[in-house]
Design a protein with these regions (language model features):
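Residues at or immediately preceding the N-termini of alpha-helices
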Residues: 107, 217, 262-265
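Short, basic, helix/turn surface patches
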Residues: 95, 139, 235-238, 304-314
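Short, charged/small-residue-rich alpha-helical element at the C-terminal edge
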Residues: 227-300
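ABC transporter nucleotide-binding domain
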Residues: 173-260
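ABC transporter nucleotide-binding domains
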Residues: 2-5, 12-207, 213
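ABC-family P-loop ATPase nucleotide-binding domain
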Residues: 1-11, 299-314
Length: 314
């Protein structure tokens, strides 16, 4: 797999404040890459450097193995910012055509693509409406279409599901998977952990302008696992005092336990067999990305903010 984007030791200052502080990571072609962090973490500044809106104060960006050229390479990038960039007084069909032509498409080619996407998203009747007449969710769908219709190699989506109902959120999600399958690379910037776990292959977690970690979602969760297991049982044993695991929580037919360091899973199963208790499920529980973030930043205000946001959406 080819590396499409490389960030090397990027730094960006605003006056004396470090918005991005020595961040490096690579993104592979066809990946769905999650860029995570609380508000003010540096995500938007990082994205604006990747798209050529800002220049880094130091460090380098390589696009397809060459030094990033903001003028020429930007045409291969589709960017959907969190603060939506649509012209409110302009008619929707003309706006989509105009934005496609800005990315180098002929009007004829743009017309074909816009009609295709409008039909796919059931937007055909919107053509003569103005953006100011659209709901937030409708504006979101239009912004997504104008971001991807020129078939960019790199697609950057900043909070793309904001304001969408579940049906349209799933529609966008399916398109993200399809675009990645067809070779587009997607950067998904968000503070919503559950969406990242569902969608992304790789992630980078940033806080206060610094990268805290990056890697595959699977590897990160396995790195931070704590020997937690969910055990489904026919009945709870009367006494749960044991030297092989600690009970974290108990319900009428299940236990969440943490195995002690030298305990094997067979030891746990043997414990219940000896008590004549049937075990009907036994599953390792990996930490959520939200749990990992909280652990890494160790109870900071950013961690509390992140915890509140993500628990409110669970």
């Amino acid at each position: 797999m080819n590396t499409i984007l490389e960030l090397h030791n990027l730094k960006k200052y605003f006056a004396t404040q470090k918005a991005v502080d020595d961040i490096s990571f690579d993104i592979q072609q066809g990946d769905i890459f999650g860029l995570l962090g609380p508000n003010g973490a540096g995500k938007t500044t990082l994205i604006r450097m990747i798209t050529g809106i800002f220049y880094p104060d130091s460090g380098s960006i390589l696009f397809e193995g060459k030094k990033f050229d903001p003028i020429n390479d930007a045409r291969h990038i589709g960017y959907m910012p969190e603060e939506r960039g649509l012209y409110r007084k302009m008619k929707i069909g003309e706006q989509a055509l105009y934005l496609a032509q800005l990315k180098g498409m002929s009007r004829h080619e743009a017309m074909q693509k816009v009609k295709l996407w409008f039909e796919k998203f059931e937007m055909q009747t919107w053509w003569h409406k103005r953006v100011e007449d659209l709901s937030k969710g409708m504006s979101q769908k239009l912004q997504f279409v104008t971001t991807v219709l020129h078939e960019p190699k790199l697609i950057i989506l900043d909070e793309p599901f904001s304001g969408l109902d579940p049906v349209n959120a799933n529609l966008i999600k399916d398109e993200i998977f399809r675009l990645a399958k067809n070779g587009s690379t997607i950067i998904f910037s968000t503070h919503r952990m559950e969406q990242v776990e569902e969608i992304c292959d790789h992630i980078a977690l940033v806080n206060k302008g610094k990268k805290i970690l990056d890697g595959t979602v699977k590897n990160i969760k396995h790195t931070f696992k704590e020997n937690h297991y969910q055990i489904g049982v026919a009945v709870l044993p009367e006494h749960l005092m044991t030297h092989i695991f600690k009970v974290i929580s108990a319900q009428s037919d299940s236990l969440l336990v943490q195995l002690f360091e030298d305990t094997r899973t067979n030891d746990v199963l043997r414990y219940f067999i000896n008590k004549n208790i049937d075990v009907y499920s036994f599953k390792e529980v990996l930490p959520s990305l939200s749990d990992i973030f909280i652990k890494l930043v160790n109870g900071s205000p950013e961690a509390r903010q992140f915890l509140s946001i993500n628990h409110n959406h669970e």
